[in-house]
UniProtKB/Swiss-Prot annotation:
A motif (NPA 2) lies at residues 228-230. This is Aquaporin PIP2-1. Predominantly expressed in roots and green siliques. Also expressed at lower level above ground and in flower buds. The modification N-acetylmethionine is found at residue 1. The keyword Phosphoprotein applies. It is found in: Cell membrane. The gene is PIP2-1.
Length: 287
């Protein structure tokens, strides 16, 4: 793949100091034969399990400490700020740990956005999403096992639309929140930025985790903050009450729409690589 060139006044054309990686093949049969592929799937499973275990346990703990009827105190526990830190901090830690193995997705919406941008193949995207959902179920299952007396009483960490908010408001909150997250992922992992600033790959988990933190601060009062279909799915499966299931579609449709908008914006508006990705889709279809 030839390097991109750009015009410099008075100097004609010069080679850029970075190279865009080629689009991932739509279906890559060769990667299915590699151990590294399945190792990455396992990493996504374990990372999502740990993510749900720590974060849902934090939510349950906060509700226990703030329940005055059960001996808690008003404004007790970590509060919304602490919950947001738990989600953002765990994403920072887990992305840092798994980025070199699986890319550190830990979220079907992130995987979907990267697939649309041709960063991952279809088989990888599908297996990642399955692994993330299974990991989420197991993670919340551990919370229920260790906090069986409190888990159901305090809502199981399940996402649902808060009273007083319309379905449209909840859906918009999930779309915008996921857009912020996936847009941050694209920006933090941009090969152009990584090539010019050698510290960027090391620091990439920090803005991603901080984006999760900020979105939680904004949307916990509305939906409990999904922006991660696996997180919402795992909690809904284990809690298994009607309210989370009634609202559950919001936590798949919203994040996937937000991820698609972020992928389109980054690839087609901010970068010229979008046309190349679209062309490779057409080439794959004609093979």
């Amino acid at each position: 793949m030839a390097k991109d060139v750009e015009a410099v006044p008075g100097e004609g054309f010069q080679t850029r100091d970075y190279q865009d990686p080629p689009p991932a093949p739509f279906i890559d049969g060769a990667e299915l034969k590699k151990w590294s592929f399945y190792r990455a799937v396992i990493a996504e499973f374990v990372a999502t399990l740990l993510f749900l275990y720590i974060t849902v346990l934090t939510v349950i703990g906060y509700k226990i400490q703030s329940d005055t009827d059960a001996g808690g105190v008003d404004c007790g526990g970590v509060g919304i700020l602490g919950i947001a830190w738990a989600f953002g901090g765990m994403i920072f830690i887990l992305v840092y740990c798994t980025a070199g193995i699986s890319g550190g997705h830990i979220n079907p919406a992130v995987t979907f956005g990267l697939f649309l941008a041709r960063k991952v193949s279809l088989p990888r995207a599908l297996l990642y999403i399955i692994a993330q959902c299974l990991g989420a179920i197991c993670g919340v299952g551990f919370v229920k096992a260790f906090q069986s007396s409190y888990y159901t009483r305090y809502g199981g960490g399940a996402n649902s639309l808060a009273d007083g908010y319309s379905t449209g408001t909840g859906l918009a909150a999930e779309i915008i929140g996921t857009f912020v997250l996936v847009y941050t992922v694209f920006s933090a992992t941009d090969p152009k930025r990584s090539a010019r600033d050698s510290h960027v790959p090391v620091l990439a988990p920090l803005p991603i985790g901080f984006a999760v933190f900020m979105v939680h601060l904004a949307t916990i009062p509305i939906t409990g903050t999904g922006i991660n279909p696996a997180r919402s799915f795992g909690a809904a499966v284990i809690y298994n009450k009607s309210k989370p299931w009634d609202d559950h579609w919001i936590f798949w449709v919203g994040p996937f729409i937000g991820a698609a908008i972020a992928a389109f914006y980054h690839q087609f508006v901010l970068r010229a690589s979008g046309s190349k990705s679209l062309g490779s889709f057409r080439s794959a279809a004609n093979v």
